[in-house]
């Protein structure tokens, strides 16, 4: 410890970034997202969903937050919403294309 180092008396432990830790993180993420799907919750970052998440997916959320780095958690939650919107847009475009083909 250096003369001027200061950690505020609190150390935040980050899981090591090893292959096995990443695998554990992904498995925890998948279990949490599966629980969200069952509870019909899309956006885990929306404060409106926090009560539902606590009542339906508390254990899965705790494991996810325990096994993944904070930056990964935020990324995965945001990516879930973006991927859903992307899939919906693709479906809509495909349906519109089919409709145009039928009308010709």
UniProtKB/Swiss-Prot annotation:
* Disulfide-bonded cysteines: 25-68, 35-57
Q: Which InterPro entries match?
A: COA6_fun (IPR048281), COX6B-like (IPR048280), CX6/COA6-like_sf (IPR036549)
What's in the GO CC field? Answer: cytoplasm; mitochondrial intermembrane space; mitochondrion; nucleus
Which terms does the UniProt entry file under GO BP?
A: intracellular copper ion homeostasis; mitochondrial cytochrome c oxidase assembly; respiratory chain complex IV assembly
Q: Tell me where in or outside the cell this protein is found.
A: Cytoplasm; Nucleus; Mitochondrion intermembrane space
- PROSITE patterns with a match to the protein in the record: CHCH (PS51808)
Q: Which Gene3D superfamilies match?
A: Cytochrome c oxidase, subunit VIb (1.10.10.140)
SUPFAM superfamilies registered for this protein in UniProt: Cytochrome c oxidase subunit h
Name the protein family.
Belongs to the cytochrome c oxidase subunit 6B family.
- Sum up the protein's function in the record's words: Involved in the maturation of the mitochondrial respiratory chain complex IV subunit MT-CO2/COX2. Thereby, may regulate early steps of complex IV assembly. Mitochondrial respiratory chain complex IV or cytochrome c oxidase is the component of the respiratory chain that catalyzes the transfer of electrons from intermembrane space cytochrome c to molecular oxygen in the matrix and as a consequence contributes to the proton gradient involved in mitochondrial ATP synthesis. May also be required for efficient formation of respiratory supercomplexes comprised of complexes III and IV.
What is the protein name for this chain?
A: Cytochrome c oxidase assembly factor 6
Name the encoding gene, please: COA6
